[in-house]
Amino acid sequence: MNIDELLKYRKELLEGATDEDGYISQTSVLENTLPSLVETKLIESEIINIVPPSSAYSVVGFSENEAGERLQLYLVDLDSVALSAADEVIIHSRKDHHSSLLKSGLDFIKKSVKRHLNDEIQDSDPLAVLCHKLGSSVYVDQIDVIEVILLSTSISVESRGKEKTPKRFFFDDEELKVSYARNRENLTKEILIQYKLIDIGYLYQVSVSQGNADPLKVSFEETFGSHIEVLKAAEQKHFESYLCVLPAAGLCNLYRKESSRLLEKNVRSFLNFKVEANREMRNTIRTAPEKFIAY
C-alpha cells in the first residue's frame, strides 16, 4: 500500500458517491462506506439514521447496537470530500485536524446531555431526535458507550524526510461523567467515549483484505489488570485451544470496549436488553447481583 494507490482508491470512492449532477454529498460518501464498517464489525448494520448535513455540529448520522447500550455518532470531514482537493488538504502527517472534528462530536454530546441545545436545535431538525434522547434520563441510564466515528476521505501518513508512508491514527478513549435520575433517585455514571477515524487507508485495507482488514487485538494485561494463566486443551496442525478462568470484571470491561466485534448475531440477540426477559436479567445483575447465579 502506497500513497499513489490510496489516491487512486480515493478518486474511485468519490466518483462512486457523485450524483448525476456531479455533486458529492457527505451522506452519499457515508452510505457508500457503511458496508466496509459492517465487514470489519465496527457497526452491526448498514441501516442507520441519516441526518441532512445542513444540520448543526456536522453530525450526519447515528445508530445504536442491537443490545441498545452503545450509541454510534457519525461525522464526515467536509474539507476532504472534494475530488479537486489539494494534497495539503487530504494528506495529513498530524492528527490535529481529525482531533478537532472528533471533539466537536463530544461537544454535541455534552450539550445534549445537559439539555443546552433544546432551544438552539428546532424540533423540525432531524438532529433534534438524537438531542432529545441524550437529554433523557431513561436514555442516559441505558447507554454505556458512545462511539464518535469520523469518516474522512483523507490520507494519514508518517513523514520521514521527504518520504511519506501510510499510517493509521488512533485516539485515546475518555470517560464522560453524567448525572441523571432513576425512580426519583439522583445518580451519576461514566459513559465511555471512543473515537474512531475511518480514512482512505482504512477503507482501502478493507477493500483488499477479504475480511481481515482490522483484526481484533486485546491486551489482556491492560483489560484484566494482570496476565491470564491458561491450560492447553488441544493441539492440531492449524489449531490450538486453551482453558482459562477469566475475571467477570475484566470480561465486562472487554465487552464495554469492543461490544459487537466480539459477538456473532445470535449472541447479540441474546444480549438485547430491549427484550423483557433480558432486561430483567440486566436489572438483577445491577441491583441484586447476589441473586443472579441462583436465577
Predicted regions and their residues:
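Nuclease-adjacent, charged terminal/linker segments that flank catalytic cores
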Residues: 1-7
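N-terminal extension/subdomain marker
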Residues: 5, 12-285
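A sequence-level detector for short glycine-anchored, His/Arg-bearing signature motifs
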Residues: 290-295
